């Protein structure tokens, strides 16, 4: 069993489920960032959605708030949660990052496989309406909470966003 676990090699060359299909890519020009493949799905259910991919341009210096998002999978078992982060810009736009299991077509998520590192991971960059929308509208058992983050120190918001993008 251990030998099988160690033989599993991560790859970007697989048939992925549509919402994990594209990897975001950031291009930097000083303070300016252009982020491609930002997911902006319109979710009706977890299997019925309008697929949209977009790009977003922004200045790192315009990040004014950071939001922490916690999704408790089952409120009766609160210790199990998924954490996301959302960056708010001075113009009101929000860009969220969720580190997720990158599922292949036909693959079903299981927490035990996750603990044994049997999935590839993907930084999903998305509109906040996408990543919170799917949780609020489509995942009936889960509870999602949004908390304003406190980041101490000058320039911390910008540095945190840049560290996630690199």
Feature locations, PLM:
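Alpha-helical transmembrane signal-anchor/signal-peptide segments
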Residues: 8-29
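Internal/C-terminal transmembrane anchor helices
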Residues: 1-7
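Glycine-rich catalytic cores of cysteine/serine-nucleophile enzymes that process amide/ester linkages
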Residues: 33, 44-144
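Flexible, active-site-adjacent loop/turn segments at secondary-structure boundaries
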Residues: 14, 39-41, 47
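Intramembrane catalytic core of multi-pass membrane enzymes that act on lipidic substrates
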Residues: 33, 37-39
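Active-site nucleophile-His-acid catalytic modules used for acyl/amide transfer and hydrolysis
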Residues: 129-166
